[in-house]
Regions:
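Formylglycine-dependent sulfatase
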Residues: 1-377, 382-405, 409-412, 417-436
């Protein structure tokens, strides 16, 4: 039996219900009144397994990426405390990044003979202290920072940020297309060799630019702009990402590795201003379900029956344990995983989150959720009320106290939030109108 290969595709700030296979209420937003914005991902879901209760490790970018790299709660590393790592404070900082000595999914698979590549966004610290090639990837093409212009490839401070390996490079073109092309080329080269490809798109993260919006790129002064974009622009960005995913999947078919490759798609956190999270409430930066419940699609013809939907609760870091389990590779004994393999149908779960932003705390235990925001506490039955509108704290006081106590027990096992941890929230009430 061949060892499986792995492709992990990560979107950036994608909402829970944006894809056709997750509701697709905005079908037609890209200009075709009859179409989903995600035909290739919809097909992937029909050929594999779709999760209804998949979660990101955080409601914001880089913390989730720490968990995806290590298989452990991001709170265990100093860099995971910033929400998120920001270029202006992290460049040259030897504390804010993924330590090269820490084992990662990429390093463990590389040491087991896999070809490894990260095509896309890194956002786990800056050279010279950190980088993909220092953490298990043999190839890297993409930006180091959290967000870049799709045409100029400059970060939020105006610094050019596109790398091939450890060398800064200049390329012409729409970033989503550049990443898709490079990923398809990587897959095509791996005939007969097991590989691990991390394809981490920046789409549909701001700036709000489709393939046709190079003039908009020249107009905006700040890529975190609040004076542009639209629902149509946003869903076109998703559609163009989906087209690239289709090219990568076609390359996989052409190599004959389709049946032996586990392909997973997800998002780093919940959606931003133009996204759809129905029926959930909340968005990026919130520990409400809309900020942390994300699409999970997994296709592995050799391992999963096609066309299934599961309500199994899962979290980003579980995919590290899952990939290692599928590959027959043991985790590093000095760095035990917090995630668990989803190949073994784990059943009811205990999942935990915390954020410095608004002093948020959350625990999902079975079907119940404990939530605290700036000291206000809530209890929700997620099966009956995934929208989190019925606070059952006083109707079920024993359940509430049990979940709060369990959260406190878990938090006591984690490092405290550092006093100097930064929160970089790019939109304020003065620039983006907020609902009450």
């Amino acid at each position: 039996m061949n060892r499986p290969s792995f492709i992990f595709i990560l979107a950036d700030d994608l909402g829970y219900a944006d894809l056709g296979c997750y509701g697709g209420r905005h079908a037609g937003s890209t200009g075709d009144a009859s179409s989903s914005c995600s035909p290739n991902l919809d097909r992937l879901a029909s050929e594999g397994l779709r999760f209804t209760d998949g979660y990101s490790n955080s409601a914001v970018c880089s913390p989730t990426r720490f968990a995806l790299a290590t298989g452990r709660y991001q709170y265990r590393l100093r860099g995971g405390a910033d929400e998120p790592i920001a270029s202006r404070t992290a460049r040259g900082n030897p504390a804010l990044g993924l330590p090269p000595e820490h084992p990662t999914l990429a390093s463990l698979l590389r040491d087991a003979g896999y070809a490894t590549a990260l095509i896309g966004k890194w956002h786990l610290g800056f050279p010279p202290h950190f980088g993909p090639l220092k953490s298990g990837y043999q190839e890297f093409f993409g930006p180091m920072s959290g967000g870049v212009d799709y045409f100029r490839h400059c970060d939020s401070g105006g610094k050019h940020d596109l790398y091939d390996g450890e060398e800064e490079v200049r390329r012409e073109g729409y970033l989503t297309d550049l990443l898709s092309e490079r990923a398809a080329q990587f897959v095509s080269r791996q005939k007969g060799r097991p590989f691990f490809l991390s394809l981490h798109y920046t789409a549909p993260h701001w700036p709000w630019e489709t393939r046709e919006d190079e003039a908009e790129s020249r107009r905006i002064a700040d890529i975190a702009h609040a004076d542009g974009g639209s629902v149509q622009t946003y869903f076109t960005m998703i559609r163009q990402m989906d087209e690239g995913i289709g090219r990568v999947l076609a390359a996989l078919d052409e190599t004959g590795a389709r049946d032996d490759t586990l392909v997973v798609f997800s998002s780093d956190n919940g959606g931003e201003r133009f996204s759809d999270t129905w029926p959930l409430v909340g968005k990026k930066m919130d520990l409400l379900e809309g900020g942390i419940r994300v699409p999970y699609i997994a296709r592995w013809p050799r391992g999963f029956a096609a066309g299934r939907t599961t309500a199994q609760a899962a979290i980003t870091m579980d995919w590290v344990a899952t990939f290692l389990d599928a590959a027959g590779v043991a985790p590093h004994p000095a760095y035990p995983l917090d995630g668990i393999s989803l190949l073994r149908e784990p059943g009811p779960r205990e999942l935990f989150w915390r954020m410095k932003f608004r002093d948020q705390k959350a625990a999902r235990i079975g079907d119940w959720k404990y939530l605290s925001i700036e000291g206000d506490e809530f209890l929700y039955d997620l099966v009956r009320d995934s929208r989190e509108r019925a606070n059952l704290r006083h109707r079920h006081p024993e359940k509430f106290e049990a979940l709060r106590a369990r959260y406190q027990e878990w938090e006591a096992t984690m490092p405290a939030i550092p006093a100097d941890a930064k929160v970089s929230f790019v939109t304020s009430k003065a620039t983006l109108a907020q609902p009450s």
